[in-house]
């Protein structure tokens, strides 16, 4: 009996020891079982297979910004190309503005933090008690002037096709809509407006403003997860033609190439714009502060339409204001000469005139060195208080001096840091098109790593916040209950910045500087 008891005890101890060792096994196991099986679409090397495909969505959009009541109305025709080998009977369209609809579920599931200083409306919004209705008002969904059947489910809309789309088919349909633009300073948001009470004007940063096609791929079919505010998006690539109607004294910054500068700009502005295309040593001021201040006082009543085109991009965004100062500079990137440009109200000066376009230029140069040559015609930094947000060729960035124009080193370096980071997003995810709604680190972590390289290579003694081992120590020493693996859905990540930005960036810094060495790492990266 004693021997049996001793044997059982020994077995139990071995079992417990084995159980204690279990959490460590996955850290060192080979990745074969965790990686998808190679197929004709995606090879074992990670390269596209011989039958790789991706869908395409082309847009013809016309929108009008109402500066009197802060609304945006628009129409679009989407031409969807089914390049898949599968027949489609319905399409999914993203309606991101519906996160601000009055029946939105977003406030019920979003994580929020209440600090000592926060607008009352932002608290109300986080509690689902906001009376603002910022959702899309869909007026029609048609094809060949005939209505289509559609179902709206919060931030997603399913369109049922009258006739299935066979492989190789394309289908065009039109949507008309409008929505109330949100006050970013009161209720937050990735886009919206900021009101300046001293002069009675607005700066509009407009994004996710049109119904956008969802991704359909061989990996998971339709990517139709709801937009809850944190996890951003993945989108099919396509060609855009966009007309933006605004008050005639507004200056527009936008994704793409401006097609009608002679109609949108004054003669003097057009001349300066042309000069900027060959100015490699310093920015050219296209709209001066004096000109912008004059327009603040004398608001135009007529309108003008700015026309743009953008090829092979996944999204489109713009900014508009009569308050904008505008400068631009040419950058030599391989065989390309993109324009680095900045748009900012007088409240951003003198910091923005000194630093923004210079930071855009340095970012394009360094990211192109580590990845691929920047392929787009422009890269734009727009001044927008309290946010940092990116879209193809354009981003919205914080960093405002004091009212007297003074600013601290902290304000300066944080402003430069956010410009580098958001301009860098043109590479991750705008070109590689990773799915941040699913895996945030593949966007933010990769971008933060190259942001760190840009800061240390282009600026002397730059106080980088993320990317070095010493800056990640407090997080890694913290309560393990609040540390998540980087392969965590974006809506479930705790300590979002440390987990999705800093941890992957630091790991790659260690891999580059200590494990592999810069030469091998840079060749592989």
Predicted regions and their residues:
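Ligand-binding face of N-terminal immunoglobulin V-set domains in extracellular IgSF glycoproteins
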Residues: 72-99, 104, 115-119
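Short, hydrophobic/aromatic-enriched beta-strand segments in well-ordered soluble domains
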Residues: 76-78, 82, 95-97, 169-183, ...
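Glycine/proline-rich low-complexity spacer/linker segments in large multi-domain proteins
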Residues: 103-118, 179-240, 260-261, 329-331
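Hydrophobic helix-coil surface modules that form long, contiguous segments used
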Residues: 211-222, 228-420, 449
């Amino acid at each position: 009996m004693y021997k049996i008891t001793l044997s059982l005890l020994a077995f139990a101890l071995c079992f417990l020891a084995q159980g204690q060792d279990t959490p460590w096994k996955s850290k060192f196991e080979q990745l074969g079982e965790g990686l998808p099986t190679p197929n004709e679409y995606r090879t074992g090397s990670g390269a596209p297979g011989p039958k790789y495909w991706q869908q395409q969505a082309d847009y013809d959009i016309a929108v009008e910004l109402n500066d009197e009541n802060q609304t945006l109305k628009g129409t679009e025709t989407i031409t969807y190309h089914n390049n898949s080998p599968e027949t489609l009977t319905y399409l999914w369209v993203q309606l991101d503005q519906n996160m601000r609809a009055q029946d939105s579920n977003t406030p019920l599931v979003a994580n929020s933090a209440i600090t000592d200083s926060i607008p009352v409306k932002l608290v109300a919004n986080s509690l689902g008690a906001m009376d603002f209705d910022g959702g899309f008002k869909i007026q029609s969904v048609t094809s060949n002037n005939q209505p289509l059947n559609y179902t709206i489910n919060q931030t997603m809309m399913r369109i049922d096709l009258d006739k299935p789309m066979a492989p190789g088919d394309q289908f065009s349909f039109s949507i008309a809509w409008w929505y109330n633009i949100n006050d970013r300073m009161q209720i937050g948001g990735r886009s919206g407006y900021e009101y300046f009470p001293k002069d009675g004007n607005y700066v509009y940063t407009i994004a996710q403003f049109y119904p956008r096609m969802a991704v359909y791929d061989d990996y998971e079919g339709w990517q139709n997860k709801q937009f809850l505010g944190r996890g951003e998006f993945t989108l099919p690539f396509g060609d855009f033609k966009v007309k933006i109607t605004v008050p005639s004294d507004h200056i527009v910054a936008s994704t793409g190439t401006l097609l009608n500068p002679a109609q949108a700009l004054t003669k003097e502005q057009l001349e300066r714009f042309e000069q900027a295309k060959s100015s490699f040593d310093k920015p050219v001021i296209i709209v001066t502060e004096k000109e912008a201040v004059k327009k603040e006082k004398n608001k135009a009543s007529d309108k003008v339409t700015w026309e743009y085109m953008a090829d092979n991009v996944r999204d489109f965004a713009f900014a508009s204001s009569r308050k904008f100062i505008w400068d631009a500079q040419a950058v030599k990137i391989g065989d390309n000469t993109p324009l680095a440009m900045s748009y900012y109200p007088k409240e951003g000066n003198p910091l923005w005139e000194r630093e923004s376009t210079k930071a855009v230029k340095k970012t394009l140069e360094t990211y192109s060195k580590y990845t691929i040559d920047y392929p787009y015609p422009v890269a734009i930094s727009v001044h927008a208080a309290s946010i940092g947000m990116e879209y193809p060729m354009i981003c919205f960035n914080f960093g405002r001096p004091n009212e007297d124009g003074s600013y601290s080193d902290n304000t300066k370096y944080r402003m430069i840091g956010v410009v580098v980071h958001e301009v860098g997003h043109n590479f991750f995810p705008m070109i590689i098109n990773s799915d941040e709604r699913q895996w945030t680190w593949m966007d933010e972590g990769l971008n933060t790593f190259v942001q760190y390289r840009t800061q240390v290579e282009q600026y002397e003694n730059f106080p980088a916040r993320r990317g070095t081992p010493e800056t990640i120590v407090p997080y890694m020493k913290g309560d393990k209950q609040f540390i998540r693996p980087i392969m965590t859905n974006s809506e479930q990540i705790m300590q979002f910045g440390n987990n999705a930005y800093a941890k992957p960036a630091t790991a790659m810094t260690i891999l580059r500087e200590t494990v592999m060495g810069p030469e091998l790492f840079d060749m592989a990266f």
